[in-house]
Amino acid sequence: MATPTRWGTPADVLRLGRVSLLTDISSEMIVGVFALCFTTVAGGSTALLGLVEGLADAAAASLDFWAGWWSDRTGRRKPFALAGYGWSTLMKSLLLASPSVASLATFRVLERLGKSVRGPPRDAWLAAIAPEARRGYAFGVHTALDKAGAVIGPLIAYGVLAWRGATPATYALLFALALIPALASVLVLARVAERRSPPRERAALRVAWRALSPQFKRYLLPAGLVALGYFSVGFLFLRARAMGFAVQDVV
């Protein structure tokens, strides 16, 4: 087991938290301006933006089951997490090219595949690292670092936009800067030691469904209805811009 830190959680939990912190800084620097860049610089329609965002959300969940199943079957966590974070970083490099509808749409959808691959194995890795009595606290620390990145990223974007103005050159600068924390996250993850779990078979989906409690199954219905009302935050950014907010204030 990893040595506890002064925060009362294993050091590797904090390392994985730093990975999420850096990744979210990178991603949120991009997400804050993506919709505006897609529609105003690349010339994409809002309808097409909605399609791209929908495909991106689908991609973000498309490989969850496979990644979790294969991670359990092999007893490995780090290769899946490293592949997911590495893939997302690689896709962000597409933004270095001249922005077009095709390149921006390709980035947005393919980059989310990395999230789908890394999510379940990383969470299983966290659960294996943390002491059982403090597992909830360990996940809380990791989530806090993740959310901190989601705050820092837009603040950086705000500063760059306020300094340089909302121009195509500024968007290109933001996309280039976003690669720095993304690359750093992969380097940090590469240094985290992996403790392999014993390989185990995962129950068939039908068997696993039957094992779920009736209360949980009833919860899925309202949760699904709430999800149906979800809309891309990009539309909120566009609406705020149309109402007269400055681009940096929208971010």
What is each of the regions a protein language model found here?
Residues 36-41, 152-175:
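Transmembrane alpha-helix termini and helix-breaking/packing motifs in multi-pass membrane transporters
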Residues 3-61, 216-251:
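Helix-loop boundary and gating motifs at the non-cytosolic
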Residues 57-65, 150-151:
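Residue-level signature of mid-helix packing/kink "hotspots" within the transmembrane helices
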Residues 179-200:
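C-terminal membrane-cytosol helix-exit motif in multi-pass small-molecule transporters
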Residues 107-147:
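Cytoplasmic helix-loop-helix junction between adjacent transmembrane helices
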Residues 79-94, 179:
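Structural signature of the two symmetry-related core transmembrane helices
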Residues 63-76, 161:
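Helix-to-loop junctions at the C-terminal end of transmembrane segments
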Residues 94-108:
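Helix-loop junctions at membrane interfaces in 12-TM secondary transporters
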